[in-house]
Each structure stands twice: as structure tokens, then as C-alpha cells.
Amino acid sequence: MDVLLGTEELEDELHQLHFNYTCVPSLGLSVARDAETAVNFLIVLVGGPMNFLVLATQMLSNRSYSVSTPTLYMTNLYLANLLTVATLPFLMLSNRGLVGSSPEGCKIAALAYYATCTAGFATLMLIAINRYRVIHQRTRSGAGSKRQTYAVLAVTWLASLMCASPAPLYATVMAHDSADALAFETCIIYFSYDQVKTVLATFKILITMIWGITPVVMMSWFYVFFYRRLKLTSYRRRSQTLTFVTTLMLSFLVVQTPFVAIMSYDSYGVLNWPINCDTINKRDAVSMLARVVPNFHCLLNPVLYAFLGRDFNKRFILCISGKLFSRRRALRERAGLGAQIVGPVCALPSKTVTLSEETRDLSQEIRRLRALGRPPPPPPPPPPPNC
């Protein structure tokens, strides 16, 4: 959603801002806008179905498999990413003026986007904290652990909504009244010039801290600690785990480090640059590049946290084969698989005789011998233990 800086609020009876073009968009701003649209289109096209499949598989498997704290955190991460991707088409079309809306609709879209992004980053930090507790064996098993996890997730979403509350307060509809183009409407976040170095700067710094610096510090601290703990394990297990952790950490830093740098530069520009057409175009171009970066996590998280794991791939195969849609069928197959693992399966004799036929023949032989006054034959010997 674009950020507009204005000198006065010109609203009509529909509470829409009317804006006449005074600053011509620069070439860099046009290129940045086209790049943002292309990247977001790719994220929606690929990340949307991927997050939907991962979330559906995770929710179906939660019905048949035991649910743990990491599983609930993963489910919440996929849900937050899917909701973020769901808001992108409206924001893309609104920025291009291809879809109209009301001020209330723009406020809801702004709240949904910033809240779901914040919840996604917070869930990543919860996953890192949970793994730290598992290493130190500080987790508690019991009936209360699941309730505590749900309480933590509820607090996370409530805090995300509170952190995202400034966005809908300043979101509104802007009506473009250009003389050489057709009139259209877009959703914007509007700040007057006297709010640039106060409200807008605070908003930029808050996003930089919550979406950028805090996740980088938390993830870096945990995985450095996790790498040190790997030295106590065997070489084979250490090499396999280290490969996964390195991939996870590098992917996160490759996405987050440019975001922190761009947002820091953007915050510096808001505080120090003068307000004129050149700096406004430059600031808008930097903001467009910055707001694309968090959306990349919606594309990477399903791959890193789901498809790189063996357990999820097995459950995904069960899901696409239809075995997870019936909870009773899934539990029956799991019980049958457990019986095969616990009890050894002995080879059948060369003559194929079912158990019911063998029992019926033996009963008939016993009744015939008793009628003749002869003792019944001894029971057959048990099968050898190493069958």
C-alpha cells in the first residue's frame, strides 16, 4: 500500500482524498513499481497454492497424528503466510488503480496485511525459542502443554493486531483527478507533511525493529547456539542436521539482511531528507523495494519448514493419495502398521491353508476320535521363536 505525503486533507462527502499530480513519477519509481508487481505476482502464483497445500496437509495430519507444540507453531506459520498472500492481490490491484474500495475496506486490508506479516515473524521466533527449550530439556509434557501453546498463539495474534493498528488508522481512499488520464481510486496510507518526522518515522522504525532486527537477532543467536550443541552428537547426525540448519539460516539471512539495510536507509531518509519531488520519488522507490522483501518468506517458509522434512513429505503423500481425509482410515492404517512392526510375521507353510480351515479340520478330527473312544491328538507345537 502506497504512502502519500500531503499538505492538507481535501476530502469529499465520501471521505475520499482528491489528489492532483504535482510530482511526476521518476523512471526509477516506475521501474520499482513494475518490479514490485512482478515479484508479488510470482509470490501469489507460487506461494499461494504452496501454502494452501502445506496448511491443508498439516491440519489433516493433526487429526490423525499426535499434536505437539512445534506442530502447532508450524500450522500457525502456514496460516499466517497464507493470509498474507491472500491480501496481496487486492493490494496489487489497488496500487494500480484497477479495483476500487471504501475507506473501511482499505483499513481492513491494511490491518490484515500488517497483522499477518507480524504474526508470521513472531511465529518464526517462537519456533526458534521452542527448539532452544527442547535442547535444554525444559519442555513439559502433559495435558496443560497444549493449552499453554494455544494461549501463546492467542497472545501472539493479539500482539500482532496491536502492532499493526497504526496502519488502518491512517489508511484511506485516494481519488486521482488527473486531467490527462482516467480518474481512478487507490488505497493509501496518508500522512501530512508535519507528521513525516514524527508519526511516519516512528512507523518505519517500528517495522524495522519488529520485522527486521528482532528476527535476525533471535534466529542468529539460536542457530549459533544450536551449532555449538551439535559438537556433542555423532558425526553422521551432526552433518545431516548441520546441513539443514545451514540452509535454513542462510536462506533467512539472505532475505532479512537486505530488508534491514533497506528499511534502515528508508528510516534515515524519512528523518533527514527534505520534502520535495526528488526525495519523495526516491523514498517511494526505496519503500517499494522494502515492502517486497517480507513477502518472500511466504514463498520460502513452506519449502524450508515443510518440504525439506521427511515426516512432512510422508504425510503429504498420504494427503494427496486421500488417506488423510478419513480419520478412522488413517488411524486403522497406523494401527495395522504398528502391529506389523511389533509382532514378527512368520512364513506360511508350503501348503496354503487358512487359519479358519485348519481350526475347522482339527475340531472335526477331535469329535470323531471322541466318538470312537480314543484320546484326542496332542496340540501342535508352537512355532519356533526365530521364525
UniProtKB/Swiss-Prot annotation:
Q: Which residues lie on this side of the membrane: Extracellular?
A: 1-33, 95-107, 170-204, 269-285
Q: Name one GO cellular component term.
A: membrane
Keywords from the named record? G-protein coupled receptor, Glycoprotein, Host cell membrane, Host membrane, Membrane, Receptor, Transducer, Transmembrane, Transmembrane helix
Give one GO term, molecular function aspect: C-C chemokine binding
**Residue intervals passing through the bilayer:** 34-61, 72-94, 108-129, 151-169, 205-224, 245-268, 286-309
Pfam families (alphabetical): 7tm_1
Q: Where is this region: Disordered?
A: 368-387
- List the Cytoplasmic topological domains: 62-71, 130-150, 225-244, 310-387
Q: Which residues are glycosylated?
A: 20
Where is it located?
Host cell membrane
Family from the record: Belongs to the G-protein coupled receptor 1 family.
Instruction: List, alphabetically, the PANTHER family matched.
Output: C-C CHEMOKINE RECEPTOR TYPE 10, CELL ADHESION MOLECULE
Q: Check the UniProt entry and state the signal peptide residues, or none.
A: none
Function text: Plays an important role in vivo, in particular in the dissemination to or replication in the salivary gland.
One of this protein's GO BP terms?
cell chemotaxis
SUPFAM superfamilies xrefs: Family A G protein-coupled receptor-like (SSF81321)
Q: How does it sit in the membrane?
A: Multi-pass membrane protein
Task: Identify this protein by name.
Answer: G-protein coupled receptor homolog R33
